[in-house]
Regions:
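Residue-level detector of conserved, well-ordered beta-strand and adjacent loop positions
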Residues: 89, 262, 374, 493, ...
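Intrinsically disordered, low-complexity, charged/polar segments
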Residues: 519-536
Length: 536
């Protein structure tokens, strides 16, 4: 059966997009692949359709249980054994987990959904390896990159874990990954000569609008104007949990029934709200960034941000939830200059070097579980996870058997490890803050917003997008494929900031992402006249 025929007979799809086909063919040839496609462009199909044709089960690694549940339900409602999916997670009992393994082993199910945490258990890894998986699909692959906006330390071990189950071909999927994040994904997952498919990040059905608000009252009136004009459902993103609760109450009192959602709510309550929103029972959801992954809802008519997001990465991911049905949708950013200070506050403080040193010393003594380390150090789960991630990145920690963590054989001394981890944390904070600066530049630009946003992700648009407020107001100017002294995506070096990658040109400016200091916008004229950059 061909890919197109499988898509038609198993999923009822009449056609596949060219970028989907390119990625699927790589999977069919048993090649590793990295796929960057916009939200709603059918990324899941890229592993699901080939998996139905390739002998052997497929392991799907995904960060959120809600995201897994939606994909499992979508596969199982088709009632075909070659599409049946099972799951191993903290939500399943030991009996259910054993039954899932049995179903895969006996050929009654094709897809095994699992989290990195479950796969890191050596006994579980051995069970999965014995199934001889034919393919590994990694959803939300940008979570593995410390360059990314949604970094998850438990993803760091995936390269090691995939080796542990026999290193089958890997397809890594994400909706948002700038060039350095793509490079990081390839390196950390140890992808071998992967097929890289990056396509179609422009969303022509989204009208992108930004308004700088002089007062809170103006911000409120702009929101109400949109709610009065537009149909439901929609999502309003706010920066804090308190803001979510207060705005939902204020909207409801004003005659616009709304619910709030944030990470501080009980798991059960969040799940109920998630399901209610998908079922069109919640017309307006006011949420923090905790509401996002797993929201596969095609008819979201608008997305509003009530403050400046922390980065173009987050913004792009969140606005991508609108208009997945292809119908016109609005995305509106209402921001104030004070939002930048708030995001700098959220980027947090730096780790304590003494705590890092003590933790590194413990790991050198003997491997321990996270529970044991929490009891010994007194560190909370979040801080411990951050510290272990930093120590792993500087070669002072590594996963061991029985869910333990230890120090590599030739790890640095605790003092050196702590200093290196602190330096890495400082670098990450600098990069994070530079992303906020890029977000502000996007909000303030009078140029085409589509060009500006895609340039951040390393995509050059030679024509204006035609679907943003600046294009509508006539301030956008086509850059005619602006070029400069260095090719886009070339590696360059600055005498002070070190190595970097050229991302884009816009009029007389160029954007470069430096490893040490993050995103910088430079004058092309000054770079050329003063020889500030050299090819690396």
């Amino acid at each position: 059966m061909t890919l197109r025929r499988a898509a038609r007979s198993l999923f009822g799809w009449k056609a596949l997009r060219p970028n989907q086909l390119a990625a699927m063919r790589a999977v069919m040839k048993r090649r590793d692949a990295l796929v960057v496609l916009p939200t709603g462009a059918g990324k899941s199909a890229i592993y699901q359709i080939p998996a139905s044709l390739i002998p052997g089960p497929t392991v799907v690694i995904s960060p959120l249980l809600a995201l897994q549940q939606d994909q499992i339900a979508s596969l199982n409602e088709r009632q075909r054994p070659e599409l049946r999916a099972v799951r191993i997670s903290s939500n399943e009992s030991p009996t259910q987990q054993a039954e899932a393994i049995t179903e895969i082993r006996e050929g009654r199910a094709e897809f095994l959904f699992i989290t990195p945490e479950q796969l890191s258990n050596p006994d579980r890894m051995a069970e999965v390896a014995a199934l001889k998986p034919a393919l590994v699909a990694i959803d939300e692959a940008h979570c593995i990159s410390a360059w990314g906006h949604d970094f998850r330390p438990d993803y760091l071990a995936l390269g090691h874990l995939i080796d542990g189950i026999g290193r089958p071909p890997v397809v890594a999927l994400t909706a948002t990954a700038s060039p350095p994040v793509r490079d990081d994904i390839i390196a950390r997952l140890r992808l071998r000569d992967p097929e890289v498919v990056v396509s179609g990040l422009d969303r022509p059905n989204l009208f992108v609008e930004v308004a700088q608000c002089a007062t809170e009252d103006y911000r409120w009136r702009r929101l109400i104007a949109l709610l009065s004009d537009d149909e439901r459902p929609g999502i309003i993103y706010v920066p804090t949990r308190r803001a979510a609760e207060e705005l939902a109450t204020r909207l409801t009192d004003a005659g616009y029934p709304a619910q709030f959602y944030h990470g501080g709510m009980a798991t059960g309550a969040r799940h109920e709200l998630h399901e209610a929103f998908l079922a069109d029972q919640v017309p307006i959801m006011v949420a923090t960034s905790a509401f996002g992954m797993g929201i596969d809802k095609p008819n979201i008519a608008w997305v509003v941000h009530m403050a400046l997001p922390d980065s173009p990465d987050s913004y792009f991911q969140e606005i991508g939830r609108a208009g997945r049905d292809g119908q016109p949708a609005r995305v509106l950013l209402l921001w104030q200059a004070e939002d930048v200070g708030l995001q700098r506050f959220f980027s947090g403080g730096l780790p304590d070097v003494d705590e890092l040193r003590d933790l590194a010393a413990l790991l050198r003594k003997k491997p321990a579980t996270k529970t044991e380390l929490r009891e010994t150090t007194g560190l909370g789960p979040r801080k411990l996870g951050q510290y272990l991630s930093l120590l792993e990145q500087v070669g002072a920690a590594e996963p061991r058997a029985r869910q333990r963590i230890g120090a590599p054989r030739y790890s640095p001394t605790p003092t050196d490890a702590a200093a290196a981890a602190l330096a890495e944390a400082e670098r990450q904070q600098t990069v994070t803050r530079s992303r906020t600066d890029m977000m502000r530049a996007f909000a303030e630009t009078t140029a085409c917003r589509g060009q500006t946003l895609l340039a951040y992700f390393g995509e050059q648009m030679t024509q204006v997008c035609g679907h943003c407020d600046n294009c509508h107001n006539g301030t956008s100017v086509a850059d005619q494929g602006a070029v400069g002294p260095f090719p886009v995506h070339s590696q360059v070096r600055h005498p002070e900031w070190g190595p970097g990658m050229v991302l884009s040109y816009e009029e007389d400016k160029m954007t470069v992402l430096f490893e040490e200091v993050g995103y910088k916008t430079l004058s092309v004229r000054v770079v050329s006249e003063q020889g500030l950059l050299t090819l690396d």
